[in-house]
Curated annotation (Swiss-Prot):
Protein name, UniProt field: Golgi apyrase
Residues forming coiled coils: none
Function recorded in the entry: Catalyzes the hydrolysis of phosphoanhydride bonds of nucleoside tri- and di-phosphates. Required for Golgi glycosylation and cell wall integrity. Involved in N-mannosylation of proteins in Golgi.
Gene label: ynd1
Keyword ATP-binding: yes
Lineage start: Eukaryota, Fungi, Dikarya, Ascomycota, Taphrinomycotina
Amino acid sequence: MVRKYGIFIDAGSSGSRLLIYSWDYDTDSSLSDKVKKLPLIETGIGDGGKWSLKVQPGISSFANNPKHVGKKHLKELLDFAAHAIPKDVHKETPVFLSATAGMRLLGVDAQNKILSHACRYIKKNYDFDIPNCSNSIRVIDGKAEGMYGWLATNYLLKTLEEKDTSTVGFLDMGGASVQIAFELPPSQLKNYKDSISTVHIGLQNGQQLEYPLFVTTWLGFGANEAYRRYLGLLIESENGKVGNTLSDPCSLRGRTYDIDGIEFAGTGDLKQCLKLTYNLLNKDKPCSMDPCNFDGISIPPVDFANTEFVGVSEFWYTTNDVFDMGGSYHFPNFYKKVDEYCGTEWETMLSRLYNKELTPSTDENKLEKLCFKASWALNVLHEGFDVPKSNTSSNDAKDGLSVIPAYHSPFTSLEKIERTEVSWTLGQVLLYASNQQLLAKPEYANYYMDPYGKLIASPSKHWMRLFPNKLFFILSFIFCLFFLFSLVLFGYDPKRRQRFKKFLLRLQRRKAPYIMSANGSYEDIADFSDDLEMSSPSKWHGPPIRTTSSHVLADRLSFTASRERTPRSPFP
C-alpha cells in the first residue's frame, strides 16, 4: 500500500483555488480480498495541515497578458503545493487545472494562450506530473463540473457504495454559471435517453458502479454574470444615459453608485427586484420538449417527495452570510429575512458591519449585492428548478425526506459535510483514483477509460487505429531515407545495382515476411483509417495504448458537453 497525492486547481471566474488530496493505492494486483468500497480520499496529505489556497482574480483576467499567468497567478499556489507534498513523490503527483465558467466566456484563442502559458510554466518550474497538457490543463464544460459536484456530494454522504441507498441531487451556482445534476429514476430513462450521462466509478473489489445522470448547465446564469445582465436590463428599461439616475430595487435604500457615467440609486424593494430578476430566466425561450424550465432547457420532472437536492457555492453563501440560514431550507423564513434586509437603510447596514455585528466573512462588497443575489437565488430555485416553496411534500407527508439526517426539506444549502468542504474537485479526484487502481490490474490490461469512467475493452490492433497516419508517415520517411541511401551508395553502377538487388532478396527471405505480410500491409493501415472520424479539438476519440503507469487516467479525465462546446487547446 502506497500513498498517492493529487493537485487539483479550480480556476473559477473570480479566483483560482488549489486543493491537495491523498489516498491509499494498493499495489497488490489481487482483487479477491478487496472489500466493496470506494477509495478513501482525504484532504491534504493526512497530517491535518492546510490543504487549500486561493488567489484572486481568476485566470481569465490574464486574457490580455497570458504570459504572466504563471508567475503572477500560479506560482503562489504551486509553491504552496510543492512545500506541502513530500518532494520524493513530486514526479508521480498529477496536477489538474480545470478552468470553469469564467474561461468559457473568453474566445478560443484567448483560452488557448492562457492555458498554454500555464502548462509551460508548471512543466518548467515544477517536477509534478503533467503527461498531457490538453487533458491536465484545460477548460472543463459545465456538465463536467456538475457531474463532479454530484459525485463529491454523494461520496461524502456515503450514498454511492450501496445501490439501495437514494442519492441526492446537486445544484451549484458559481459566479458565471449554474449546474444541476441528479440521478434519473428508472421510469424516466426511456424518455430522456438522449440526455443521460452515465458515470462509472470503480470499487476496490474490481466492480464498477453505474449511475444514469441528468446533467446540464446554464452559462451566464451565475450570480456575477446575472448581476451584469441585470444592470444592463436596468439601463435598457429606463433608457439610461450619462447624467441620468436610475432606480435599483435590488440595492438598499440610500446606496448610490456610478457605472460608466450612469448613476444608480437603491430603492430596496424586494418585490420589484424579484420581478426584474425573473425576467433574467428567459422563461419565454422555447424548449424542444416539455416541461420547459428556463432559457430553453427542459429538466426531467422531479418528484420532490422522493428526491432531495443540496446546493453549494452561492446557494450557501447567500443563505448563510448575514442571514445565518444555511442548511435545511425554509422558504417563508428565508423570504422574510431577505425582505427585511432589502428594506434596510444602507448606512444602517454599514454601521452593523463596522461594529462587527455581522459574520466575519461579510464585507462591504457582499452587502452591496446581497439583496440581488438573494432575489436571484429565490427565482432560480423556485421559478427555474421548480423547488416547492412549502416544506410539505407533494403527497402531504409532513416530514419530507430523510436522506440527510435531521434535514426535512427538499433543498439544503451546504458548505461542508462531516467537516469536509463540498467541492467538485473532490468528484474529479474520486473518478481519477477509483478507476486508476482498476486499470492497473492485469484483468484490465486491454481496457481504457472513457470520459465518464467506463472501462472499455480495446479492439484488436488498437495501436494502429490510434496512430494510422503517424505510422504511415514514419514508414514512408524510413523508405525515402533508405532509397536515398541506396542511390548514394550504389549510384548507377550496374555491378553495385546487382549486388543491391541480391541484398534485397536475401532481406526479403529472412526478415521481410514479418514486415511485408498481410498483417502489416499499407492496405490494412488504410482500411483502419476509414473507421476514424476527424476529431474536433474538444473531443477525444479512440482507445489509448495500455499502460500500468499512474498517467493512464490523467489522459482520460476529459468530459464533453452536449450543450456547451468548450474547445480544448491545441498544445504543442
